[in-house]
Amino acid sequence: MTTLSNLSVDLVGEIFSRVPLISLSEVRCTCTTWNTLSWNILSENYVFGKADTSKQFLGFVVMNSKVCSLRLDLQGIHNNDFVDPSLKEINIVDQYDISNIFHCDGLLLCVRWIQPRSKYHKFHRLDMYAFGYDKQQQEPDEETVTLSCIRDEQLAVLYQPYDLCLDLFMEI
């Protein structure tokens, strides 16, 4: 009996080529191999066959201090068809006043602005943030994230796309 993890790479690629990007989260949960292949498609634009995923966009925006996911299907844009964007508010951070967001390598970093402690604080337009993980751990935890910041802000790692697995708020 053939299992999902034993399917040929070409067949899995054909399946991915028919799955819209906005529905990929359900496919990623199928098995570890499919999860890995989906990351190749998303992060490296490695697409098997004639994939429709290369014509889709997923991003994040801040509107009225609310974090929203923006999904845009670009199929048909060359045929002058109307491209209907999908804008969905992420309600998990409603109680926070988000001022800025950053998206990198599957993590969404939300920054909440607070009043600087010093009246001489000059970094307003030069804000810099960084996040990553510690590779020297014996058993790396995918949900462990190290945050750093050059100013007095509250930072939050909200979640990995397609998987609400981490909800951590801390003051630096």
Swiss-Prot record:
Matching Pfam families: F-box
Annotated signal sequence range: none
All copies of domain F-box, residue ranges: 1-51
SMART domains recorded: FBOX
Name recorded for this polypeptide: Putative F-box protein At3g13825
Species this protein is from: Arabidopsis thaliana (Mouse-ear cress)
Lineage, opening ranks: Eukaryota, Viridiplantae, Streptophyta, Embryophyta, Tracheophyta
